UniProtKB/Swiss-Prot annotation:
Modified residues (Phosphothreonine): 19
Biased composition (Acidic residues): 256-266
Subunit structure: Component of the condensin-2 complex, which contains the SMC2 and SMC4 heterodimer, and three non SMC subunits, NCAPG2, NCAPH2 and NCAPD3 that probably regulate the complex.
Lineage: Eukaryota, Metazoa, Chordata, Craniata, Vertebrata
Organism whose genome encodes this protein: Homo sapiens (Human)
This protein's UniProt keywords: Chromosome, DNA condensation, Nucleus, Phosphoprotein
Name assigned to this protein: Condensin-2 complex subunit H2
Length: 605
């Protein structure tokens, strides 16, 4: 035992020092243990040869621990070597820079050879070198912070609240300005421009947006241009390619009150009607300064045009702007209609006494108010025009249509029995009473819930059929309807076969005698010829059914537990099959001994 503890001491108590782990030869110990495993023969020899699984587990765990410590030690050595090399090179470069600065030699004049630098293993450089500053060290580089492009400037919260995006539950998901496509300007070539860059999307490619500025470029550049603080967005849909009239030259700029009164630059006339519908978006001075300087010019305020000239006929086929705000239209009050009391009767109310005046039938009133039979075009009169009346109408039509179909089926059955009688559809309508005003043939409309297959079946039935044709038709109909039960029939057949197999077994088990382990133990003891004589178990249960053999086996185990019998078998794994033998030790049963048992203290003297 002491040899084993000394041998695996590093496994029981792991070595904390990384350098001492190199003294452990993991490969040699694993090889020795592998040889021991090869020599061990696992067999059924009553436990003489055993395998120590705890020792194997500790060996594997300890070997992995020692190997990981070796890897960790190598990792730390690599870090130390890299830090030493990089620190030495950094010190050499710093000293050379200071010498060049003291001598006044320009470092950029002589090309230096590019030296190999080691790749840093850390993502974050060591910040301790930037703590100590030297007095004679002056910053040689000036960090220039690049200006963020205007297209990437995040909009303000107030701008986001103007056009929010709601979900079905009413939650605010995002804003229109959160998506780049909504704020980009489409180019005539099909590209989305983050910034216009002097090109108006209303003009084709290669055309200058302001023709007048090309003539007087010198004067235009000399004059100061004002850029609007608020810029209207260009519509994303429905661009017109017709160039509008542009000013012939640069407009004279007004000052004083005109500059204070006008805070936005207007677009040319070609884009003014479409851009006027867009809400104006507020821009910061930084954003407005980044816009191109020749994009828009301030126009002179002209005389207002009359309303008749400005108003144009709207084009019904014009593409709409998905981000445009809809015009508010005045509310038009509809004309109310009262529903007759006999049309819709509420359930659950008390019965009221019928009035003396007989109200008109709803179907007749609806046809008189809704359809015009005299006119061939059947124009609608001033009648109900809302969905509730449609629902009531089609409900009434469905009821009459179902009644009509029942009468048709009854007539068809009577025609089969009495072929001499031939009635038409108009005769069946007389049985409905007031159903003469139902619908004319050209006005018949199949309701939504009607099944066209039923109507097809009624049309397919001839007026008179012979007996053979009728029988053949019924047989074909029965075969067609029984196709859907084929799968259920196969499943029921399998269930019936299973029940036929299981039911006899269940009935046989119900007929068996209830199992009593003491009763079967008494029967097994009575079969022994005498005491202390070995008798095979197969002879004791010879000629009995399988379930009786199982019960006798359980009873013999209980007898062996009570030391009434002794059980033995032949040695060997395969040779011991069906070699069970029993020997009766005593005829006295254990449960009977406990029933008649009396403690010595309770015995009478």
């Amino acid at each position: 035992m002491e040899d084993v503890e000394a041998r695996f001491a590093h496994l029981l108590q792991p070595i904390r020092d990384l350098t001492k782990n190199w003294e452990v030869d993991v490969a040699a110990q694993l090889g020795e243990y592998l040889e021991e495993l090869d020599q061990i023969c696992i067999s059924f020899d009553e436990g003489k040869t055993t395998m120590n699984f705890i020792e194997a587990a500790l060996l594997i765990q300890g070997s992995a621990c020692v190997y990981s410590k070796k890897v960790e030690y190598l990792y730390s050595l690599v870090y130390q070597a890299l830090d030493f090399i990089s620190g030495k090179r950094r010190a050499k470069q710093l000293s050379s820079v200071q010498e060049d600065r003291a001598n006044g030699v320009a470092s950029s004049g002589v090309p230096q050879e590019a030296e190999n630098e080691f790749l840093s293993l850390d993502d974050f450089p060591d910040s301790r070198t930037n703590v100590d500053l030297k007095n004679d060290q002056t910053p040689s580089e000036v960090l220039i912070i690049p200006l963020l492009p205007m297209a990437l400037v995040a909009p303000d919260e107030m701008e986001k609240n103007n056009n929010p995006l709601y979900s079905r539950q009413g939650e605010v998901l995002a804003s229109r300005k959160d998506f780049r496509m909504n704020t980009c300007v489409p180019h005539p070539r099909g590209a989305f421009m983050l910034e216009p860059e002097g090109m108006s999307p209303m003009e084709p490619a290669g055309v200058s947006p302001m023709p007048g500025t090309q003539k007087d470029t010198g004067r235009t550049e000399e004059q100061p241009m004002e850029v609007s603080v608020c810029r209207s967005p260009v519509p994303a849909l429905g661009f017109s390619q017709e160039p509008g009239p542009s000013p012939e030259g640069p407009m004279p700029l007004g000052g004083g009150e005109d500059e204070d009164a006008e805070e936005a630059v207007e677009l040319p006339e070609a884009s003014a009607p479409k851009a006027a519908l867009e809400p104006k978006e507020s821009r910061s001075p930084q954003q407005s300064a980044a816009l191109p300087r020749r994009y828009m010019l301030r126009e002179r305020e002209g005389a207002p045009e009359p309303a008749s000239c400005v108003k144009e006929t709207p084009d019904p086929w014009q593409s709409l702007d998905p981000f445009d705000s809809l015009e508010s239209k005045p509310f038009k009050k509809g004309r109310p209609y009262s529903v007759p009391p006999c049309v819709e009767e509420a359930l659950g109310q008390k019965r009221k006494r019928k009035g003396a005046a007989k109200l008109q039938d709803f179907h007749q009133w609806y046809l008189a108010a809704y359809a015009d039979h005299a006119d061939s075009r059947r124009l609608r009169r001033k009648g109900p025009s809302f969905a509730d009346m449609e629902v009531l109408y089609w409900t009434h039509v469905k009821e009459q249509l179902e009644t009509l179909r029942k009468l048709q089926r009854r007539e068809v059955a009577e025609q089969w029995l009495r072929p001499a009688e031939e009635d038409h559809l108009e005769d069946s309508l007389e049985d409905l009473g007031a159903a003469d005003d139902f619908l004319e043939p050209e006005e018949y409309m199949e309701p939504e819930g009607a099944d066209p297959r039923e109507a097809a079946d009624l049309d397919a039935v001839p007026m008179s059929l012979s007996y053979e044709e009728l029988v053949r038709r019924n047989v074909e109909l029965f075969i067609a309807t029984s196709q859907k039960f084929v799968q259920e029939t196969e499943l029921s057949q399998r269930i019936r076969d299973w029940e036929d197999t299981v039911q006899p077994l269940l009935q046989e088990q119900e007929q068996h005698v209830p199992f009593d382990i003491h009763t079967y133990g008494d029967q097994l003891v009575s079969r022994f010829p005498q005491l202390n004589e070995w008798c095979p178990f197969a002879e004791l249960v010879a000629g009995q059914p399988a379930f009786e053999v199982c019960r006798s086996m359980l009873a013999s185990l209980q007898l062996a537990n009570d030391y009434t019998v002794e059980i033995t078998q032949q040695p060997g794994l395969e040779m011991a099959v069906d070699t069970m033998s029993l020997r009766l030790l005593t005829h006295q049963r254990a449960h009977k001994r406990f029933q008649t048992y009396a403690a010595p203290s309770m015995a009478q003297p």
